[in-house]
Amino acid sequence: GEAQTDPGRTHIDGKAHFLQDEIAGINERIFEKRKRDDNLTRRIHSIKRDLKASIDRFRREYELDWLVAENVLSLPVHLPLGLALAEYLSETGIRSIAHHHDFWWERHRFLGSPADDLIRAAFPPTTPNILHVVINSIAQRQIAHRAGLPAHLIPNVMNFHDKPGPP
């Protein structure tokens, strides 16, 4: 969706941004209006296929051995991207780290949605080549309880009371 790195070392696919109009429309229909029909499901899968191909191009272009998924496999704010990445990782077996900040089951808007089957398939995926990392012990217990997945704990905190040291 977007990057803050050198454009020569970056692969950006506009369809990957969760604020992209079509994705915002999908989210509105599923999570606000609570509606899903065959046309919407087909569109989700069509975008998923395009994104999966983009992920593959990215991996091949940069000859990656690992992929790091930063909070993309925990919250379904971009269903097609999460599905694409989960499916790609499952099919290729590429090693990956899924870094989770928070999960869909922590947000009321995602509970009981008409896309529950899609959410459970990819958020988080249970593929064995994925190393799950969470930022707190509550999330570590919840991912184990809800998804049967072990997760490593790497706290994502900063001390805002003290000034940072020199770089």
What are these regions (language model features)?
Residues 1-167:
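Catalytic cores of nucleotide-sugar-dependent glycosyltransferases that transfer UDP/GDP/TDP-activated
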